[in-house]
């Protein structure tokens, strides 16, 4: 699981299915199911097309 120290305050920590931690470049970002991609707050992940939609 992610801790506050994992990523800077301007980023969001995402955990991959393998349990690895990564940083999303958005503050309060939304992690996609793959744990690799992420979207800005207020959007959702389009898993099929790997993009963010409103």
Swiss-Prot record:
One Pfam match: Granulin
Keyword Secreted: yes
Region forming the signal peptide: none
InterPro entries: Granulin, Granulin_fam, Granulin_sf
Superkingdom, natural source: Eukaryota
Tissue-level expression: Brain.
Predominant location: secreted
Keywords, in A-Z order: Disulfide bond, Neuropeptide, Secreted
PTM entry text: Six disulfide bonds are present.
Subcellular location: Secreted
Gene Ontology annotations of biological process type: neuropeptide signaling pathway
Cellular component GO terms, alphabetical: extracellular region
Family membership noted in the UniProt record: Belongs to the granulin family.
Protein name: Pars intercerebralis major peptide D1
UniProt source species: Locusta migratoria (Migratory locust)
């Amino acid at each position: 699981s992610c801790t506050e120290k994992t990523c800077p305050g301007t980023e969001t920590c995402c955990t991959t299915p393998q349990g690895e931690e990564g940083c999303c470049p958005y503050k309060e970002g939304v992690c996609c199911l793959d744990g690799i991609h992420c979207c800005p707050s207020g959007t959702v992940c389009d898993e099929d097309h790997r993009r963010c939609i409103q």
